[in-house]
């Protein structure tokens, strides 16, 4: 995947596996290499930024890569039925969901007061699921004196991974058994490159 991203970021994308023969060969089934949970942002399509083709990636996209039951079910399906060996949780630079959650936190102090970072899957009390999850990541970052938007985006990826692992016994077991590796990443709109995150 990173080789494909290098091609994309250098303007040398090959657009593989997008021909008629590939499409017809996938009619009876799929065997993607990885599952990717990423933001719905129209500037961040995983298949394009990783220069992948039809059948290569099983993608789930939500605003701010937030997690709900449908997301967990989709990733569990990818593990159990499609046997993917890699899960990628990818945030990105200049994320609108992060900006929206930050604006909400700055406008309403009671949102901060509703949050405890003692639980890795704790959320803020808000009607907006984006504010509940992404806002919690922002406050977690701030509690560690990480105060830039870049920090918030990286911490949100880390908390999203923690949330997935804590809430899905299927994902837990697959990681423990060595069947799946889960990786955090962040796409840089300014360069077209994907950075792999370490936590």
Which residue ranges define each predicted feature?
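Catalytic core of membrane glycerolipid acyltransferases/transacylases, capturing the structured
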Residues: 43-60
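Conserved functional hotspot residues or short segments at active or partner-binding sites
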Residues: 89
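Divalent-metal-activated hydrolytic enzyme cores
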Residues: 2-29, 54-55, 64-84, 96-199
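Short glycine-enriched loops at secondary-structure junctions
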Residues: 38-44, 63-66, 92-95
């Amino acid at each position: 995947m990173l080789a494909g991203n290098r091609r994309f970021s250098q303007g040398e994308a090959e657009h593989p596996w997008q021909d008629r023969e590939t499409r017809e060969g996938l009619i009876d089934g799929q065997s993607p290499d990885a599952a990717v949970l990423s933001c719905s942002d129209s500037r961040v399509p995983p298949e394009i930024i990783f220069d992948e083709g039809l059948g290569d990636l099983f993608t789930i996209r939500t605003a701010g890569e937030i997690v709900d039951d449908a997301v967990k079910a989709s990733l569990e399906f990818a593990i159990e039925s499609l046997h993917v060996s890699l899960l990628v949780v990818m945030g990105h630079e200049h994320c609108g969901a992060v900006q929206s959650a930050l604006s909400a936190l700055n406008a309403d102090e009671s949102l901060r007061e509703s949050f405890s970072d003692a639980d890795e899957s704790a959320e803020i009390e808000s009607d907006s699921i984006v504010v509940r999850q992404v806002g919690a990541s922002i406050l977690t970052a701030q509690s560690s004196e990480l105060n830039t938007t870049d920090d918030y985006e990286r911490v949100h990826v880390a908390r999203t991974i923690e949330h997935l692992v804590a809430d899905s016994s299927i994902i837990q077991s697959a990681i423990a058994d060595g069947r799946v590796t889960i990786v955090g990443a962040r796409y840089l709109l300014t360069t077209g490159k994907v950075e792999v995150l370490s936590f």
